[in-house]
Amino acid sequence: MPRFVDRVVIHARAGNGGNGCASVHREKFKPLGGPDGGNGGRGGSVILVVDPQVHTLLDFHFHPHVVAPSGKPGAGSNRDGAAGIDLEVRVPDGTVVLDENGRMLADLVGAGTRFEAAAGGRGGLGNAALASRARKAPGFALLGEKGQERDLTLELKTVADVGLIGFPSAGKSSLVSTISAAKPKIADYPFTTLVPNLGVVSAGENTYTVADVPGLIPGASEGRGLGLDFLRHLERCAVLVHVVDCATMEPGRDPISDIEALEAELAAYTPTLQGDSALGDLASRPRAVVLNKIDVPDARELADFVRDEVAGRFGWPVYEISTVSRDGLRPLIFALWEMVKKYRDAQPVAAPRRPIIRPIPVDESGFTISSDGEGGFIVRGTRPERWIAQTDFNNDEAVGYLGDRLARLGVEDELLKRGAKPGCAVTIGDVTFDWEPQTPAGVDVTMTGRGTDIRLEQTDRVGAAERKAARRERRQPGESGGEDS
């Protein structure tokens, strides 16, 4: 039997963005070709996709690292790097995604449902994209951003209409194998079923699914036995069925006490999907009771004796069956279908809607400055930290461009207000450097000559405006001479 895994921790790492390219256009008879470095490609993202053909998380148990490809760097002649291909990871229907703190990020139900587990990094800009009127020929490019990287917990919660619960060896697996084509492991010792088993049951022209959950014992909601690991599979079941062993010889066991003990465990269990599921908690689900093994004479007598008491105390329908002689199975199959149908009819049918995208403006201009306790300062903010990651500190011009951007954002002025002195340590992101003011406060940083091509300043080529002014001056003497004559 294939190994069943319903809870794994994966390490998702998206691809990094490609670096931008710093190059100059070279062509015959064009000495001032200008910058033509292309942008880097976007890194690939890690996307979880529901696949109905996948039924377990076993692959992630052996291969927990999921890595998407990175983007390609830019090249000369304005060639942008290729974007990394998104990595689509197939997961079973009913997978719940949790973050490191146990907070639910996504509940993946339905074939084709997608969730971006890790976003790819943005590609760096080439020097062609960085060129401006004040910086005509940048000799640098921006680095690509790193892709998102985080640990995620995947939990599989079986999607079934009916969930069978009961003590070990109550006959749940036998019932599933009898009313469906499922072939679970069946034996005459407790905890034979170690994994949930799903079966598709036909009630005339209608079908529904039944889940056989491993046997529960008192204390399952606190971790005893196997119940805590598999109670989560009951969260999506619309109907819960108590399978009671009427032929048990264990002391202190009877149908009434078995049902009460299991109900106490269901009431103590807190579903992960309680706040987001339309089913509500486990205590509010419709119930049914199945008195099993009535092919044994003593078991039939006990079932006839407690049938009315169970129905009167709990108010649930009671059915007497035998998976060996198949007595009572047909009425049970159709009765469960009626309960499932009643639940399905009560669910509102969502009309197909056209998706409407309303982008939310994100203000990334904010930043905070705090003291590090040793005479230095720590700058935190989306833009400053991203700019640090994009800067090639081996390129003096790129470092100067970073300083200009920080000054325009107001970081430099705020450091001066907080008493920062030249040479003090300033930490932004993962980089700590000795701070030196770029320009005195109040001076426009774009007036600096950084990032310009000195050849453009030395050229004697006459511009269009200068030629127009020269023509105007040449006309003026002729016009005045004509008036004198």
UniProtKB/Swiss-Prot annotation:
Residues 160-341 form the OBG-type G domain. GTP binds at residues 166-173, 191-195, 212-215, 292-295, 322-324. Coiled coil: none annotated. It is found in: Cytoplasm. Mg(2+) binds at residues 173, 193. It comes from the Bacteria. GO terms for biological process: ribosome biogenesis. PROSITE patterns: G_OBG, GTP1_OBG, OBG, OCT. Its main location: cytoplasm. Residues 359-437 form the OCT domain. One of its GO terms (molecular function) is magnesium ion binding. Keywords: Cytoplasm, GTP-binding, Hydrolase, Magnesium, Metal-binding, Nucleotide-binding. Residues 450-485 are annotated as: Disordered. It is an enzyme of class 3 (hydrolase). Its EC number is 3.6.5.-. GO terms for cellular component: cytoplasm. The keyword RNA-binding does not apply. It holds the Pfam family MMR_HSR1. InterPro entries: G_OBG, GTP-bd, GTP-bd_Obg/CgtA, GTP-bd_prot_GTP1/OBG_C_sf, GTP1-OBG_CS, GTP1_OBG_dom, GTP1_OBG_dom_sf, OBG_GTPase. Its cofactor is Mg(2+). Belongs to the TRAFAC class OBG-HflX-like GTPase superfamily. OBG GTPase family. An essential GTPase which binds GTP, GDP and possibly (p)ppGpp with moderate affinity, with high nucleotide exchange rates and a fairly low GTP hydrolysis rate. Plays a role in control of the cell cycle, stress response, ribosome biogenesis and in those bacteria that undergo differentiation, in morphogenesis control. This is GTPase Obg. It comes from Mycolicibacterium smegmatis (strain ATCC 700084 / mc(2)155).
